[in-house]
Amino acid sequence: TKRQAQEIIKENAERCGQYYVNQRWLGGMLTNWKTVHKSITRLVKLNEMFEKGELAGYTKKELQGMKKEQEKLQLELGGIMNMGGQPDLVFVIDTCKEALAIKEAKKLGIPVIGICDTNADPECVDLPVPGNDDAIRAIQFYSEMISASVLDGMQAMIAEKGVKVEEMVEEKA
């Protein structure tokens, strides 16, 4: 993911409760889920270890190595840590840079929405959105629109089931 898009993607994905990858796409993140899930399990185990203070019996060097591993895994997999399996849709900012993610999604039949700049091939994504994938303001705009659409879709789905969003808000209060 482009450096200028990393924080924007994280904020908007968290705002609508969706999973995200805002660092380098790891090969096999979708197509080799078993291996990725093992890494996520390791991350959860390390997080629990450090939170509970179960650090007795480890040397300073071992603890330092585990902390470094935890930070690396958190950076790479933190946005998909609670994802149970394949996503229903993949949204990509730069279709040229994220070609591997698009290829994996296509292989699994997952629809892809992609921002296609003038240097990109719109044929590689299912729903191309023509636009600038470099400018921070443009990235912010696209991310906010997708986030708002997800929230609208969730609200419509909840309303369809007969639950009013206002009632849910009142129950939580």
State where each predicted segment sits.
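Short, ordered loop/turn segments at secondary-structure junctions
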Residues: 1-3, 18, 23-28, 95-97, ...
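Phosphate- and divalent-cation-binding pockets in alpha/beta enzyme and binding domains
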Residues: 4-8, 100
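Long, charge-dense
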Residues: 8, 12-66
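Short, well-ordered alpha-helical segments in soluble proteins
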Residues: 44-54, 67-70, 74-77, 81-84, ...
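Extended, charged alpha-helical interaction scaffolds
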Residues: 60-92, 96-113, 117
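Short glycine/threonine-rich loop/turn motifs
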Residues: 101-103, 108-159
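Intrinsically disordered, compositionally biased charged tails
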Residues: 152-173
